[in-house]
UniProtKB/Swiss-Prot annotation:
Gene: KNAT7
Pfam families reported in the protein's UniProt record: Homeobox_KN, KNOX1, KNOX2
Chief site of localization: nucleus
DNA-binding region: 215-278
Keywords of the record: DNA-binding, Homeobox, Nucleus
Organism: Arabidopsis thaliana
Lineage top rank: taxon: Eukaryota
InterPro entries: ELK_dom, HD, Homeodomain-like_sf, KN_HD, KNOX1, KNOX2, TALE_homeobox
Transmembrane segments: none
Subunit structure: May form heterodimeric complex with the TALE/BELL proteins. Interacts with OFP1, OFP2, OFP3, OFP4 and OFP6.
Protein name: Homeobox protein knotted-1-like 7
Length: 291
């Protein structure tokens, strides 16, 4: 980054005798960047790129290194005294550089989430296929472990009939490197959690909209308490034949302020709710008449 910045500042010097001058200009420019208001943003963009492909168990290493960075920052800042480039030009450069880093981070995330996961899953498929064909169980970073019945079989693949050694000093049955390491598994788990979070965030608003629509329809389907009181009173008075005529419905519409469709639906639902009770009452009545 410093070399690119020097190029933008026009600080190109030639000749072996100017090496010390170039080195000093580098130090001065580092100092200006270290004391620039965008330094924290620049550092965060770098770290964000680094975190993308770093397994979860190794993230504390980054934090530990960042905790020690203030020593280097203080050293750079001390060299910036009395040396100033065109501030506007440096501002533009750092702003563009941060944008490049943000774009690079997105590309890294795309690579990790698609290509890296596909590669690891392909290795897993190879492992499963090999197990189906040979019964071999592959151990991470080690050779295949065969079943007990096959332990005594000679498996010397160190060279072929041509006398050429293809093993390179390693056991040719060792398919371990094809398997995902603990770091790769950790990375896959991190990608899975990030994708899960993104999906949850992406669908959160949609889920809330659907929930609100359901609640709205429920609220719309419920009739005010005072109106249902009028309908229930009519029902109690006509429980033997709870089928209002058109004139009855028109009167209920006037009294309750409900729509005719709402009243029809209420009586339909009310008859369904009381169907069992009515059937039981009719059966009892018929039974009494027989006796």
């Amino acid at each position: 980054m410093q070399e690119a910045a020097l190029g933008m500042m026009g600080a190109t010097v030639g000749g072996d005798g100017d090496t010390a001058v170039v080195a000093e200009q580098n130090r001065q420019l580092k100092g200006e960047i270290a004391t620039h208001p965008m330094y924290e943003q620049l550092l965060a963009a770098h770290v964000a790129c680094l975190r993308v492909a770093t397994p979860i168990d190794q993230l504390p290493i980054i934090e530990a290194q960042l905790s020690q960075s203030h020593h280097l920052l203080r050293s750079y800042a001390s060299t910036a005294v009395g040396y100033h480039h065109d501030r506007h030009e440096l501002d533009n450069f750092l702003a563009q550089y941060v944008m490049v880093l943000c774009s690079f981070k997105e590309q890294l995330q795309q690579h990790v989430r698609v290509h890296a996961v596909e590669a690891v899953m392909a290795c897993r498929e190879i492992e499963n296929n090999l197990h189906s064909l040979t019964g071999a169980t592959l151990g991470e970073g080690s050779g295949a472990t065969m079943s007990e019945d096959e332990d005594d079989l000679p498996m010397d693949f160190s060279s072929d009939n041509s006398g050429v050694d293809f093993s390179g000093g390693h056991d040719m049955t060792g398919f371990g490197p094809l398997l995902p390491t603990e770091s790769e598994r950790s990375l896959m788990e991190r990608v899975r959690q990030e994708l899960k979070l993104e999906l949850k965030q992406g669908f959160k608003s949609r889920i809330e909209d659907v929930r609100e629509e359901i609640m709205r329809k429920r609220r719309a389907g419920k009739l005010p308490g005072d109106t249902t009181t009028v309908l229930k009173n009519w029902w109690q008075q006509h429980c033997k034949w709870p089928y209002p005529t058109e004139d009855d419905k028109a009167k209920l519409v006037e009294e309750t302020g409900l729509q005719l469709k709402q009243i029809n639906n209420w009586f339909i639902n009310q008859r369904k709710r009381n169907w069992h009770n009515n059937s039981h009452s009719l059966t009892s009545l018929k039974s009494k008449r027989k006796h």
